[in-house]
Amino acid sequence: MNLSFYGAARSVTGSRHMLEVPGFSVLLDCGLFQGRRDEAFRRNRDLGFDPKSIGAVLLSHAHIDHAGALPVLPRYGFSGKVYVTRASADLTTIMLEDSARVQESDCRYVNNKERRGGRASVHPVYDSNDVGKIARRFEGVRYGDTLKIAPRLTASFHDAGHILGSASIRIKYTAKGNTTTVLFSGDLGRANMPILRDPEPPPPCDILILESTYGDRLHEQFGEEMTKKAQDLLEHARLYKSKIIVPAFAVGRTQELIMRIKELVGEGRVDPIPIYIDSPLALKATEVFRRHRECFDEETLKTFSSDDDPFASRYIHFISSPEESKRLNTMKGPMVIISSSGMCEGGRVVHHLKHAIQDEANVIVFVGFQAEHTLGRKLVEGWDVVPIFGVPMKRQAQIVKFNGLSAHADRHDLLAYVRAIHPPPSSVFIVHGEEKQALSLAATIQAEHPGMEISVPHMGSTYDV
């Protein structure tokens, strides 16, 4: 059995890991690289392997850094199935459709500017036709079911508690009377977060592929201090008639923000101000949430059973058309605009940043991880001048970060996950974390488990397991 790592190796984007057994290859995730345009352009077309050689894909969840390159596969001969939870199948389809539209739109915008500079045109990685081809290969599965994906090879999906439908995936391979079990954590969530159930305890395994997004840090808890911080932000917008721009994932983070704002209003801590969810994808994703209540925790289920939609209110407005989106840029505050993409690498939020970033009364609020080289990372790091659509712009808006909203397990959670596996795995591969985070987590696990073989793969590396 071989394990190869073609993405999210000492980085957090482009999750792609391949498990090879005699006569069959399984791809774990097929994510889109995000970051420097030229590098992303190359890596999203050259996947590092031959898609024709892939027998099946096992998809952990719908986020673009895990699922975003799936439509590239059928272009180059992939003809197998994509196994995915039913909620993730619905979410992934709409996210890939949105990704194709955003790529096409952004390429048109950039090409108009590049043409004037005499530079070559850029093209989308895939189009909506490619999305349709891969979506027809999705096979929805339920949590806990064991499915046979090839002779002597089975897989089961376990609730990871990260986003709706997210899963850790356990793979069993039996040969010559011996069974080897591989557990791919996917992205792990946190306990006691809104909407979703807590992550399931890990099942036993011989080999663990573990994410490390926050492998060297701990999250704040969304307690009274952070609630007061959110309350103050909304009051700031009211006082200065300003805009709060929130780049947020359309799936998971947007729905959580809606619920938390509703809680503040419902408790009488703030008066409502207009909240604009400027993302057609978020609107579609929220409908998927409503359809897949099997993923909800008890509290959210009770809210639905009381005939109260946790994702709706009179002051919450979902924006669909480009015309409505553009109108927001000419409107006066106070208002909150929640828009994707979460790392500011495309989508409507970039246009809102362009119009809001040079007003010191406005606030840009980050509520999730920002990968290296993204516009979001530059803003979080405090760059005074940032490139927006290729044009340097001076930042005067305030930058605020909420760490307590992360849907990712932190260092404590990840270490607890490893400790919960009985008996301990013989090998652990640390992925989906920037090098500093991955190496820090690896060193701590090694110190706690001296007999365990810990690896932090480089891009393109292969291991005989």
What spans do the regions from the language model cover?
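Short active-site oxyanion
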Residues: 55-56, 78-81, 243, 272-274, ...
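Short secondary-structure boundary/capping segments
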Residues: 98-102, 106-110, 224-226, 261-264, ...
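Active-site neighborhood of phospho(di)ester-bond hydrolases with catalytic His/Asp-centered motifs
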Residues: 28-30, 54-63, 70, 82-85, ...
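Core dinuclear metal-dependent hydrolase active-site scaffold
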Residues: 1-52, 133-197, 323-330, 336, ...
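Metallo-beta-lactamase
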Residues: 99-163, 293-332
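Cap/insert and terminal regions of metallo-dependent hydrolase folds
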Residues: 91, 168, 189-278, 363-368, ...
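Pre-active-site segment of Zn-dependent metallo-hydrolases
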Residues: 9-11, 21-136, 188-198, 381-388, ...
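Hard-cation-handling environments
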Residues: 231-372, 387
